[in-house]
């Protein structure tokens, strides 16, 4: 069992959060899992729909553009040839097969679990009390949001905030306060966070409810 301290809006310790040992259990080659997961995320963002027409697919007359002899020009067969404007493309991109990269749920959960555990072990994950997200700021105040980061000794660089989806109606004050800070990378919700968000973020501030929900989701089916 691992204990993490949680902080209130003023940087004071407000209790502890327990994490099961199964959360830190590593399955297989962890770095390879993370690499495969990130490659899948980045590859699947592409549409894979680039398609060009060759000379047999473009719409052109098959009539010769000019007579075979007597003009002084090189002989030409039709305007669909690639050297003409509007002609077919040679060796252009074609969606020949489904190029999306697939990764199963077990691998995805193991990769996210490894990334989160690394953030915890390097002291780059701060657990905030739920009141920080829901009750601390009723109106947007960037200065107060920055003061919270400094009071928790969070390095103001690449900070990702993660909250529980059930708080979406109540965290608008904090969310709007953070969007004007260059140090804040983004605002995500527990079950929607992916490995690319975690890799890109240098520091993470997560609410207690989001962390417990995420840990329960990621450790379901693992051996204690």
Swiss-Prot record:
Part of the 50S ribosomal subunit. Belongs to the universal ribosomal protein uL4 family. This is Large ribosomal subunit protein uL4. Pfam families: Ribosomal_L4. The keyword Transmembrane helix does not apply. It comes from Chlamydia felis (strain Fe/C-56). One of the primary rRNA binding proteins, this protein initially binds near the 5'-end of the 23S rRNA. It is important during the early stages of 50S assembly. It makes multiple contacts with different domains of the 23S rRNA in the assembled 50S subunit and ribosome. One of its GO terms (biological process) is translation. The keyword RNA-binding applies. Residues 54-73 are annotated as: Disordered. SUPFAM superfamilies: Ribosomal protein L4. GO terms for cellular component: ribonucleoprotein complex; ribosome. The lineage of its organism: Bacteria, Pseudomonadati, Chlamydiota, Chlamydiia, Chlamydiales. PANTHER family: 50S RIBOSOMAL PROTEIN L4, LARGE RIBOSOMAL SUBUNIT PROTEIN UL4M. Keywords: Ribonucleoprotein, Ribosomal protein, RNA-binding, rRNA-binding. GO terms for molecular function: rRNA binding; structural constituent of ribosome.
């Amino acid at each position: 069992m691992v204990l993490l301290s949680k902080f209130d809006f003023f940087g004071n310790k407000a209790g502890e959060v327990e994490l099961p040992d199964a959360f830190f259990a590593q399955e297989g080659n962890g770095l390879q899992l993370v690499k495969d997961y990130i490659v899948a995320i980045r590859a699947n963002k592409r549409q894979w729909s680039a398609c060009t027409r060759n000379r047999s697919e473009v719409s052109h007359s098959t009539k010769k553009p000019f007579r075979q002899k007597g003009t002084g020009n090189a002989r030409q067969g039709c305007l669909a040839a690639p050297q003409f404007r509007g002609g077919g493309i040679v060796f252009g991109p074609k969606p020949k097969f489904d190029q999306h990269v697939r990764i199963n749920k077990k691998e995805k959960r193991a990769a996210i679990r490894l990334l989160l555990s690394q953030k915890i072990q390097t002291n780059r994950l701060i657990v905030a009390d739920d009141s920080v997200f829901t009750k601390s700021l009723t109106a947007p105040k960037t200065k107060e949001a920055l003061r919270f980061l400094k009071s928790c000794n969070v390095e103001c660089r690449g900070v990702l905030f993660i909250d529980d989806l059930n708080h979406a109606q109540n965290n608008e004050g904090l969310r709007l306060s953070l969007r004007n800070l260059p140090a804040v990378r983004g605002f995500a919700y527990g079950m929607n966070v992916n490995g690319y968000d975690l890799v890109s973020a240098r520091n993470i501030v997560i609410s207690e409810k989001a962390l417990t929900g995420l840990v329960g989701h990621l450790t379901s089916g693992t051996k204690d």
